[in-house]
């Protein structure tokens, strides 16, 4: 697989996350650390799915654990601060991209039973090719969370 777009999307996320002017979500949504923890959780799960396919098993993907507040807080607490968390997300993103770079055409076309929720709504409940799961990170998931981080900057400016 070609991960150029995904790597580029991550770089934009890391630039946004490194800002020192990130406030709280005005709508009670996730703060910057929770957004990063969510991305880390999703990336680790998709990397595990990809490695499972390579090993010959047929894993599934369910993003509900990456939406769980307790799990996100656990991930945040495991880090010494935002820089440490960003470093871990960066490392996990690199691992995921490196795995994807080495997937064969056959492996990337394996259908993965998937359940995806977003904002408490079911987005997907059907098999999706592994490549589609990974490409969805670049096309939607990472840019959406990058925008969330940028919106946290705007929230600070509005309250200044």
State what each model feature region is:
Residues 10-18, 43-51, 90-104, 146, ...:
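Structural signal for well-ordered, non-membrane alpha-helices
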Residues 11-34, 55-61, 102-126:
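Helix-loop segments that flank and shape redox-cofactor active sites
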Residues 11, 24, 68, 98-101, ...:
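Glutamate identity and glutamate-enriched acidic tracts
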Residues 1-6, 22-42, 72-88, 115-141:
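Alpha-helical scaffold segments that form or flank carboxylate-/histidine-based iron centers
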Residues 1-4, 45-95, 156-160:
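Short, helix-capping/interhelical loops that line the mouth of catalytic, cofactor-
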Residues 135-160:
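A hydrophobic membrane-anchoring alpha-helix module
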